[in-house]
UniProtKB/Swiss-Prot annotation:
Record keywords, A-Z: Cell inner membrane, Cell membrane, Membrane, Protein transport, Transmembrane, Transmembrane helix, Transport
Gene name linked to the record: exbB
Subcellular location: Cell inner membrane
Annotated family: Belongs to the ExbB/TolQ family.
Gene Ontology terms: biological process: protein import
Biological classification of the source: Bacteria, Pseudomonadati, Pseudomonadota, Gammaproteobacteria, Lysobacterales
Name of this protein: Biopolymer transport protein ExbB
GO cellular component: plasma membrane
Membrane topology: Multi-pass membrane protein
Domain of life: Bacteria
Assembly and oligomerization: The accessory proteins ExbB and ExbD seem to form a complex with TonB.
Signal peptide positions (record): none
Length: 253
């Protein structure tokens, strides 16, 4: 269809250079601002894409800081736990960690479960009779790992949604721009570049913006998916070692 526009424009003898100067982003914004009612759909598309881009970059930055913090904290916290001479000192070391630190929270949950089960062992009909110490600690660790793993997924759904839908939002602007070009041709009776350059330029720009929003979101989603998988594997390994320590008293380090 665009090829037909160019052929018709050449036959009409219009000035392509002047027409193509109307296809820039600055010209599009000027037209949208001067007559917002005529560009209602374009405004909706543009604002939606800007909001999607802002949200995806926000969660990208948040995940970068979180991944950096977890990478430095993983070995530090686990080493602090296993280097403690006894369980009391290990628990105290975990309590000194920041409240948002996941490895220390997993260790504290395991310690609390073991202590709670020990207190209940002497009670009649308590959980000490229904669940063994190993089972009780294992359940607490599973819940802790699941909780902390879920927190790692914050923003991931949004990144996936932006990466999957932003091109189609931009495509909506493309379709609407070409539709506007056809309406303009019907109203003026001219298929010259002068008549269609603005709407077609708008269409192409909206497509480019949609891709510009989607591509970083897709890269971020794939990168953080890999990072989160690595962190979750460390959660599982630490939880397994904690289970052996609190359930049987054996140290892995």
């Amino acid at each position: 269809m665009l090829q037909e526009f160019v052929i018709a424009a050449a036959a009409g003898g219009s000035n392509p250079s002047a027409a193509l100067s109307q296809m820039g982003f600055e010209h599009l914004i000027t037209e949208m601002t001067s007559s917002p009612g005529d560009f209602a759909v374009s405004w909706v598309v543009l604002i939606t894409l800007i909001a999607m881009s802002a949200a995806s970059w926000y969660w990208t930055v948040i995940n970068i800081f979180r991944a950096t913090r977890l990478k430095s904290a993983a070995d530090r916290v686990t080493t602090a736990f296993w280097d403690a001479p006894n369980a009391q000192d290990a628990i105290r070391a975990m309590e000194e960690q920041p409240a948002s630190e996941p490895f220390s929270k997993i260790a504290l949950d395991a310690a609390q479960a073991a202590a709670h089960h020990q207190r209940a062992e002497g009670s009649t009909g308590g959980m000490g009779e229904s669940l063994s110490r190993s089972e009780f600690v294992d359940r607490a660790l599973r819940q802790a790992v699941t909780r902390e793993s879920t927190k790692l997924q914050s923003g991931m759904t949004l990144l996936a949604t932006v990466g999957a839908t932003a091109p189609f939002v931009g495509l909506l602007g493309t379709v609407w721009g070409i539709y506007g070009a056809l309406i303009k041709i019907g109203a003026t009776g001219s298929a010259s570049i002068d008549a269609v350059a603005g709407p077609v330029g708008e269409a192409l720009i909206m497509t480019a913006i949609g891709l510009f929003v989607a591509i970083p979101a897709v890269f971020a989603f794939n990168f953080f998916s890999k990072v989160n998988s690595s962190v979750i594997a460390k959660f599982d390994t630490f939880a397994h070692d904690l289970h052996d320590f609190f359930a049987t008293g054996s140290r892995v380090r």
